A protein has these predicted regions:
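Conserved phosphate-binding elements of NTP-dependent enzyme cores
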Residues: 1-839
Length: 839
């Protein structure tokens, strides 16, 4: 970036980091320019996020919060001080995390982007309101804004117009039937009697058995229903009693399950539908809800039609439509509609309407620049992809027009098609133009090439990383011989990691054929997935990739494998030979520090048994269970096996420190005395706490004589996870690391009956890591598996056997299969947006 003015020697133009030791950082000293776009690159586990989030963001946010009063700080969750000697000149910091939290059931695109605030205000202030006395519409006026009553021209009655909060489905405007969720759960009658060849006595009405209402069989017989004939032979009248019979008392003779005792009981009849409804009301925990859920089906609320709004909230009209109809529009459509609102109002109302509309348009402008114009305002927040949620978060930050803030972004290119990269860079440039600084952790070479300054961490992952390999301008880093990202930035190197299947041989192993009706933005379509191949599903944001794969293909395959009915929108599925579908996502593994790499992959069980067989363990009476740091006798009594203790410092955030007694090993002193003889080693080897402190690669030689443990660790090494420590807590792993760890149990076994589905597995991966990942997928394919990947990474797509490209645009402009074939065939298709970047 060119500087138009001479540099002021007294002006602070960089952040100074000295002695950073967060996670695997090795006393890193680095200067980060202020007022510039700074990219942080490096292989997975090299320390990128540790530097950006663990040091820069942690210190920037902590120091800002320290300026607040102690009373205020007590009410704010605070991060502890980073493990760093000194950080100077760091501004107040905001972080846009790699994976924003999945919103709750009440969140929509409109609420999370705050667009609905302006829209509700518009309908409240300038809408034509409904008279509650006669139902007539009252022409728009300034009375609502002036807090004056409205006068109905039809009946002359006065009433108060609704405020913006009374039009919100999260408060006063919620539909009373569904509570503002838009969804109603009804009993699925087909699930109540899945096998009509059985009689009621044989358990045809499964709900009476599984929900502990076995007596209902006898009561049903007392109601006049034949219980000893197949259900399919019952008359319509008998079926009506089973499903909808009245709650009448009947006298029955009940035989105890044990013994020959009989008892006479007067029992009220609960028909099959009421049994489910009653159990749903009484369900107090997740287990109870799960037991009932299989008899329920979710659908749009019958009263509000899925709009979430009450009848009163749907009353006000603007330009002839109500609030529910306005939220059903896409953002593109809503902006065009909003532009015409002021001119249709009386002259005295136009300035107020123009102000509200401008507020809406300014919020929408950033979202449109980030390629989200295809989303409807009522789109459920939980159905948004990770990339969509992150871009909504980014748009909110930019809209605030702050200055002097350090924005730290973790993988801002998540979910972003190459066609949307320019919009993202434009937003980051706007932040800098407002006087802010941006530090972004990313792997996309197009994003990194646009940075003013690059910092590359490495050279390897874990203990082999944590140092600054190269830094400077893009050209400087590209020319640095030590840089691993340099050859990819300069175009001298491309990702090529696997042999691809020839087009003529693509369907030699069979195919999965899928036909579906419309869902969300996806139109009716049919698609063929070649079995035993690596398949990439591509397309711009909102083109329907997630809907096709995660909401159609995966549930359809799961239902077929379980022998259950296909989802309602799936018209046909031919997946002969497929009995398993594995969705491998990047959600964190476990929620607390007790879950570690060793426990998740199962190697700790093998190690505990091995140490329990030693002479020292036998003499002390230790069993395998005693070597568990969760429940065993050998766990540290001070930290209870967590490896950490929390210090309560009043007015300051709790400080988690390594347990001083076990030094974070999780084991008590006695465990260190149990050592195991190792193959080819003189004397005794390591204790279990010492072994757990090693990386996977370091531990492999120490378990050479333990076949099961060795194979599990070798698999982790082959997955590119050899740098992980056995005792490392799994919630701290990155999304890519979590995905590969979940695959560990699947490697090395036949997979011809399996389909593996991945949603953007290259998130956070350096081009070298992408090569490793492609090698992992090739192993699955070699074992017979079909691997389906939703992906934007062009290097990955170019290495796929088959590409299904959705589009051509997002939202209403997409939703169909534009092209399918080999990467070369898709690149040759003029309608394919992805193809333009593959060519």
């Amino acid at each position: 970036m060119e500087k138009s003015q001479a540099k002021d020697p007294d002006r602070i133009d960089h952040i100074e980091v000295r002695g950073a030791r967060v996670h695997n950082l090795k006393n890193v000293n680095v200067d980060i320019p202020l007022g510039e776009l700074v990219g942080v690159a490096g292989v997975s586990g090299s320390g990128k996020s540790s530097l950006a989030l663990g040091v820069l963001y942690a210190e920037g946010s902590r120091r800002y919060l320290e300026a607040l009063s102690t009373y205020t700080r007590r009410r704010i969750s605070q991060a502890g001080k980073a493990a760093v000697d000194d950080v100077r000149y760091v501004p107040a910091a905001l972080a846009l995390h790699q994976r924003p939290a999945v919103p709750g059931v009440r969140s929509t695109f409109g609420t999370s982007s705050e667009l609905l605030n302006s829209l509700r205000l518009l309908f409240s202030r300038v809408g034509s309101h409904v008279c509650p006395h006669c139902g007539a519409h009252v022409p728009p006026s300034l009375n609502v804004a002036a807090e004056l009553p409205l006068v109905c021209p039809a009946c002359g009655q006065k009433f108060r117009g609704p405020g913006a909060e009374e039009l919100a489905f999260n408060s006063g405007g919620a539909c009373p039937t569904c509570g503002g969720t838009g969804v109603a759960r009804t009993v699925n009658r087909a699930a109540l009697v899945p096998d009509e060849s059985k009689s009621i006595d044989e358990g045809a009405v499964v709900v009476w058995g599984s929900l502990m209402w076995d007596l209902m069989k006898q009561v049903c017989g007392a109601m006049g229903v034949r219980t000893n004939v197949p259900f399919c032979e019952l008359t319509p009248e008998e079926r009506a009693i089973v499903f909808d019979g009245p709650a009448e008392k009947r006298h029955i003779l009940y035989k105890a399950k044990k013994g020959d005792n009989f008892a006479e009981l007067d029992f009220t009849y609960f028909n099959a539908v009421r049994t489910v409804e009653n159990s749903l009301v009484k369900a107090k925990d997740e287990k109870g809800l799960k037991r009932v859920a299989k008899f329920l089906v979710e659908g749009p609320c019958p009263d509000c039609g899925g709009t979430r709004l009450s009848a009163a909230a749907r009353g006000p009209l603007v330009r002839g439509i109500n609030l529910a109809e306005a939220t059903q529009m896409t953002l593109d459509e809503a902006c065009a509609w909003m532009a015409g609102v002021p001119e249709g109002l009386p002259a005295e109302m136009r300035p107020m309407a123009a102000s509200i509309c401008e507020s809406f348009q300014s919020t929408a402008r950033r979202l449109l620049e980030l390629g989200l114009g295809y989303l409807s305002l009522d789109r459920a927040g939980s159905t948004l992809s990770t990339g969509e949620r992150q871009r909504v978060q980014l748009a909110r930050s930019v809209r605030n027009r702050t200055t002097g803030v350090l924005y730290v972004m973790d993988e801002p290119s998540i979910g972003l098609h190459p066609a949307n990269v320019d919009g993202l860079l434009g937003v980051m440039r706007d932040l800098i133009a407002d006087g802010n600084s941006v530090v972004m952790v990313d792997h996309d070479t197009r994003i990194l090439a646009a940075a003013d300054h690059l910092v590359e961490m490495g050279p390897a992952a874990g203990a082999g990383g944590g140092t600054v390999v190269a830094q400077g301008g893009v050209d400087e880093v590209a020319a640095c011989p030590e840089s691993l990202i340099g050859p990819y930035l300069s175009g001298k190197k491309r990702v090529e990691a696997r042999p691809r299947t020839a087009a003529d041989d693509m369907f030699d192993l069979g195919r999965i054929h899928l036909e579906s009706s419309g869902l969300h933005t996806v139109r009716p379509l049919c698609a063929d997935v070649p079995k035993g191949r690596l398949v990439a599903v591509t397309g711009v944001s909102g083109s329907g990739k997630t809907t096709l794969v995660l909401e159609t293909l995966v549930p359809a395959l799961a239902a077929a494998a379980a022998g259950e009915p296909l989802p309602a929108h799936v018209m046909a599925l031919d997946a002969a030979g497929v009995s398993r579908v594995n969705l491998v996502d990047a959600t964190p593994i476990g929620t607390n520090v007790r879950s570690t790499v060793a426990t998740y992959c199962g190697v700790l069980d093998d190690l505990r048994r091995a140490y329990a067989r030693t002479d020292a363990a036998r003499e002390a009476g230790y069993k395998a269970g005693d070597f568990s740091y969760n429940t065993g006798r050998l766990r540290c009594p001070i930290c209870d096996g967590t490896g950490q203790i929390s210090l309560d410092v009043q007015f300051l955030p709790d400080v988690d420190i390594d347990c001083p007694d076990c030094r974070a090993s999780r084991y008590g002193a006695a465990a260190a005395g149990v050592r195991r003889a190792e193959k080819g080693a003189d004397g005794l080897g390591l204790s279990l706490p010492e072994l757990m402190a090693l990386s996977v690669d370091e531990a492999l030689p120490h378990v050479a004589d333990l076949k099961r443990a060795r194979e599990k660790l070798q698999t982790l090494h082959d997955l590119g996870l050899g740098y992980l420590t056995l005792g490392e807590a799994t919630p701290a792993l990155s999304g890519g690391e979590a995905q590969r760890l979940k695959l560990a149990s699947e490697m090395g076994r036949g997979q011809a009956d399996a389909v593996f589905v991945f949603d953007e597995p290259t998130i956070g991966l350096h081009p070298r890591d992408v090569e490793t990942l492609l090698g992992v997928f090739q192993r699955l394919v070699d074992q017979g598996a079909t691997v389906v990947v939703v992906e934007h990474d062009l290097d990955f797509i170019a290495n796929a056997d088959w590409v299904i490209d959705m589009g051509p645009g997002g939202g209403e402009a997409g939703g169909r299969v534009v092209a399918c074939g080999t990467p070369e065939q898709v690149a040759a298709c003029p309608q394919s947006v992805t193809g333009r970047y593959l060519g």
